[in-house]
Amino acid sequence: KASLTAMGLEAKSFKGHLLFEPWTVQTKQGGFYKVYTPLWRAVRDREVPVPLPAPARIPGPETYPSSEALGAWGLGRAMQRGAAIVAGHARVGADLAQERLAEFTSGALRHYGAGRDIPGEDGTSKLAENLALGEITPAQCWHAAQAELDRGNPGAEIFRKELVWREFAYHLLHHTPQILTRNWKPAWDAFPWSEDASSAKFTAWKTGRTGLEF
């Protein structure tokens, strides 16, 4: 914003990536929540504004600046052969994100409480990528869950709690940005991590073979 203002351009920002901005949620002592459950209790009954519909028309400039073809960026190159596998499951864009939400609320949401933890069941919302990319907002998900909650859908409250888990993570990042590069608790600095990248244990971890086989 400062850079744009210096150029004589007005910049405005509007919240939408989170349900509640981190600085609007405080403990009684004026601090931030370091544990999830008290945060959930503090926000579960807060009003979440109903999202506005998309504008019918967005005026464009008389001329557009030169640009590049997105395909030329080779964004999937780093994934190598995995890109083709992921492409079969990705649903990109706001319209498909809304379809995914509708499918979830009319289906798997009813058994979400247990179904989301069972790998053999199609029990999750699959909305993580859409939320991360801004193709759907947490407010849209919240109100869809609220509508199902009003209908007596038993999984709706669990889904709202999961949305607040996402909020909790972002709130911690806002208040303690050092956790991106350092341990949450200094005592963990002495944890005996393995430094041998060629060890059998590290190889097993990279290939998802550290747990119990199904």
Regions found by a protein language model. Give the residues of each.
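Aromatic-residue-lined binding/catalytic grooves and analogous aromatic/hydrophobic interfacial grooves
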Residues: 4-6, 11-12, 28-29, 131, ...
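Short, structured secondary-structure boundary patches
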Residues: 6-9, 30-38, 195
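Acidic carboxylate-rich catalytic motifs and surrounding loops in phosphoryl-/glycosyl-chemistry enzymes
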Residues: 13-20, 116
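Glycine/tryptophan-enriched, flexible segments
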Residues: 31-187
